[in-house]
Amino acid sequence: MNFNATLIGQTVAFIIFVWFCMKFVWPPLMNAIEARQKRIADGLADADRAVKDLELAQAKATDQLKEAKATANEIIEQANKRKAQIVEEAKAEADAERAKIIAQGKAEIEAERNRVKEDLRKQVATLAIMGAEKILERSIDPAAHSDIVNKLVAEI
């Protein structure tokens, strides 16, 4: 093995090249690699955070949907109760109106009945007076009297 000046020159040049690369080339490459690793790690962390945020938002939306459904069911239930109340009030009002109309009808019937009775009394009184006049016009004959009374009874 011959060591000559060329081999020593090449070794010195290689050592200088390695030193130059370690001093000036390697640090920017390492910085670029580390920056890229950091960006990738940050991106993965952001993705994980986004997934968690999405899950949280979905859970929140599900809760809000359940709450909205519960509120809607409550409103529907209240509306049904109000409807039933209105129907009951209308029935009660209709029953009261019906009772009022029936009472009014009964009162009208009673008034008409009383009027008819009064008319009948007047007619009976008139007939009785007419019968008495006829009896008085004739002689006080018991046979004629009986005949007139029978006619009056037949007319009444």
From Swiss-Prot:
- Keyword Transmembrane helix (UniProt): yes
A Gene Ontology molecular function term of the record: proton-transporting ATP synthase activity, rotational mechanism
InterPro entries reported in the protein's UniProt record = ATP_synth_B-like_membr_sf, ATP_synth_b/b'su_bac/chlpt, ATP_synth_F0_bsu_bac, ATP_synthase_B_chain
What CDD domains does this protein's entry cite? ATP-synt_Fo_b (cd06503)
Q: Which Gene3D superfamilies match?
A: F1F0 ATP synthase subunit B, membrane domain (1.20.5.620)
Q: Alphabetically list the UniProt keywords.
A: ATP synthesis, Cell inner membrane, Cell membrane, CF(0), Hydrogen ion transport, Ion transport, Membrane, Transmembrane, Transmembrane helix, Transport
Q: Give the bilayer topology.
A: Single-pass membrane protein
Location within or outside the cell:
Cell inner membrane
Which Pfam family, any one, appears in the UniProt record?
A: ATP-synt_B
Which regions span the lipid bilayer?
A: 7-27
Q: Which GO terms describe its cellular component?
A: plasma membrane; proton-transporting ATP synthase complex
**Sorted alphabetically, which HAMAP family does this protein's record hold?**
ATP_synth_b_bprime (MF_01398)
Summarize subunit and interaction data from the UniProt record for this chain: F-type ATPases have 2 components, F(1) - the catalytic core - and F(0) - the membrane proton channel. F(1) has five subunits: alpha(3), beta(3), gamma(1), delta(1), epsilon(1). F(0) has three main subunits: a(1), b(2) and c(10-14). The alpha and beta chains form an alternating ring which encloses part of the gamma chain. F(1) is attached to F(0) by a central stalk formed by the gamma and epsilon chains, while a peripheral stalk is formed by the delta and b chains.
Q: Which family does it belong to?
A: Belongs to the ATPase B chain family.
* Purpose of the protein: F(1)F(0) ATP synthase produces ATP from ADP in the presence of a proton or sodium gradient. F-type ATPases consist of two structural domains, F(1) containing the extramembraneous catalytic core and F(0) containing the membrane proton channel, linked together by a central stalk and a peripheral stalk. During catalysis, ATP synthesis in the catalytic domain of F(1) is coupled via a rotary mechanism of the central stalk subunits to proton translocation.
Q: What is this protein called?
A: ATP synthase subunit b
Q: Which organism does this record belong to?
A: Shewanella sp. (strain ANA-3)
